[in-house]
Swiss-Prot record:
Signal peptide: none annotated. Residues 295-304 have a biased composition (Low complexity). Residues 289-374 are annotated as: Disordered. This is Uncharacterized protein C9orf43. The gene is C9orf43. It holds the Pfam family DUF4647. Residues 349-369 have a biased composition (Polar residues). It comes from Homo sapiens (Human). Residues 305-320 have a biased composition (Basic residues).
Amino acid sequence: MDLPDESQWDETTCGLAVCQHPQCWATIRRIERGHPRILGSSCKTPLDAEDKLPVLTVVDILDSGFAAHHLPECTFTKAHSLLSQSSKFYSKFHGRPPKGLPDKSLINCTNRLPKFPVLNLNETQLPCPEDVRNMVVLWIPEETEIHVSQHGKKKRKNSAVKSKSFLGLSGNQSAGTRVGTPGMIVPPPTPVQLSEQFSSDFLPLWAQSEALPQDLLKELLPGGKQTMLCPEMKIKLAMMKKNLPLEKNRPDSVISSKMFLSIHRLTLERPALRYPERLKKLHNLKTEGYRKQQQRQQQQQQQQKKVKTPIKKQEAKKKAKSDPGIQSTSHKHPVTTVHDRLYGYRTLPGQNSDMKQQQQMEKGTTSKQDSTERPKMNYYDHADFHHSVKSPELYETEPTNKDISAPVDAVPEAQAARQKKISFNFSEIMASTGWNSELKLLRILQDTDDEDEEDQSSGAE
């Protein structure tokens, strides 16, 4: 390293072994670099940048300048230089464009992007009535259109989209949009409550009642009357008509090129809109089903009551028709008989010896029961005969020493048993129930007639 003589240096250092002076440290660093201060220099070297105050350089570069290679038609304004002519950095920017800035051909391009239009609802007349209280304005994006040129370069065309808003605006007020940079976001304007009521002249042609589907009109119009719709009904119908294609074409991304303005009502004052017919039908179906279920339960309870009452009457008739005196004289061997309402007296299995005699008795009793069934039913309907019989009565007869071939001896015994039964039945009826005199007489006569017929049939056998 070629260094000048130390006599020409303008440097001073202390001779301490452990130096704590910052000036000495700076001197040592300059000497190590090979640039010590020299005394009596004829020309002054420019001061280092470290010894000067910092200079702020401002360059106006648009965000879209980064996409200059992909968008040759884009326009950029020339950067306004805030540097003075005397600054040493001016020579760097003078004569050639700074690094990162676009060319002059792009700066001087005559094609300029128009300003992105923003629809302000404060200056827009909304076709809503005076009762508008809560409104929500939604921006619904759609997919951007990307076209590829013949040379293989992708270009974004500036597509102006006419806003098919539900407000019925003119062409000058419609929200025409153009494709901008991907980072451009347009915030939705704030809604305004208007106090003016507008007629149907402000509405577009597709919002009229004639162009709307008839099924929607039937749901929203009370009673199915084809009257003129109010503005809020027309807005609601138009939204229902336009929601389906928007949902199909809605992209996943939030930022898009096409925007549509839609108005959603939160509070609807019309009862026809708040309660459409399909909701009423659901409510009616629920109430009708509940009523039908209650009616079925009541019918089942009534049927159960009707089933219980004939059982009691049947048991009472069984007790009245049973005659142990006749049964005791009609068998040689012990036979068990059961009284049934349909078949009269029938034998239990095991008594095969007397089957023929039992069949003859069954024929006589069934014919007797058919002749006396109707008057007995009427009789028991008028008088409550409360006799709790838990099971059908079984009568077991023991063998007797008398011969069946002698019917003359059996007749006095049957008459005696009949008289005892009549007296017993009469006393029991008087003690248990308080019947009328005519009913008592009818009951006694029926018992005597039944017993006479049974005696005749047994004597014939």
